[in-house]
């Protein structure tokens, strides 16, 4: 069983009750309560997450193409980099948004080039950030094909977070294939399309995770930091 952890122990709050045995209990409780509940933001792995200077969270997105291929992504966003354009409330992911899922804002119109300088959330610490993603597809894939899809899915992180894959991050994408739908004779073309969909879904799920997150402690939620009238 593949696994990864999201480090959220230095974000404030009382951690005295988090004894080692509690993590086993958390996993058991999560598996026992699995269902169709689609809560996002401050839930599950997103509860203690932060993203740059904003509260991070749990986000999801999905796509289905005209051929019945379906992709779904779940992201726990605890990134060092920011998901919004510097000086603006728009997400880096805005071109890929569907149905106003993270605010439905118009295209951003920065007056100046995007600045190269990055204002970090600070203080600089050991690598304690990461964005973890799980991507599921209904295609029948071999292990090498699944690996290629996971590689392409990582592009979604690069679209949604700046900077990304930094020395402070441990970004990771897990991909699983349910095997319900076989690829056509145009295998590489199918894989290209599915890989494109995985990247789009990861990108959107990252933005949704931050958009849906609520303020917690000293970390402001996106909609508190950027009220509607700003």
Set out the residue ranges of the language-model regions.
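A structural signal for small-residue-enriched, beta-sheet-centric alpha/beta enzyme cores
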Residues: 1-230
């Amino acid at each position: 069983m593949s696994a990864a952890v999201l480090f959220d122990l230095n974000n404030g709050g009382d951690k005295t009750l988090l004894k080692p045995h509690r993590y086993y209990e958390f996993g058991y409780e999560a598996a026992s309560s699995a269902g169709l509940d689609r809560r996002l933001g401050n839930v599950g792995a997103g509860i203690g997450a932060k993203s740059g200077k904003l509260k991070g969270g749990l986000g999801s997105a999905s796509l289905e193409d005209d051929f019945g291929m379906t992709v779904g992504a779940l992201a726990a966003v605890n990134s060092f980099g920011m998901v919004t354009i510097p000086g603006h409330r728009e997400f880096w992911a805005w071109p890929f948004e569907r149905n106003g899922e993270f605010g439905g804002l118009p295209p951003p119109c920065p007056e100046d080039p995007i600045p190269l300088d990055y204002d970090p959330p600070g203080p600089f610490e050991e690598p304690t950030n990461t964005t973890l993603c799980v991507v599921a597809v209904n295609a029948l894939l071999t292990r090498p094909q699944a690996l290629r899809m996971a590689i392409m899915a990582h592009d979604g992180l690069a679209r949604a977070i700046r900077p990304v894959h930094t020395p402070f991050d441990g970004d990771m994408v897990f991909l699983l294939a349910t095997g319900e739908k076989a690829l056509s004779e145009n295998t590489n073309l199918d894989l290209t399309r599915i890989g494109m969909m995985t990247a789009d879904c990861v990108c959107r799920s990252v933005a949704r995770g931050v958009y849906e997150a609520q303020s917690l402690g000293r970390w402001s939620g996106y909609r508190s930091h950027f009220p509607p009238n700003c």
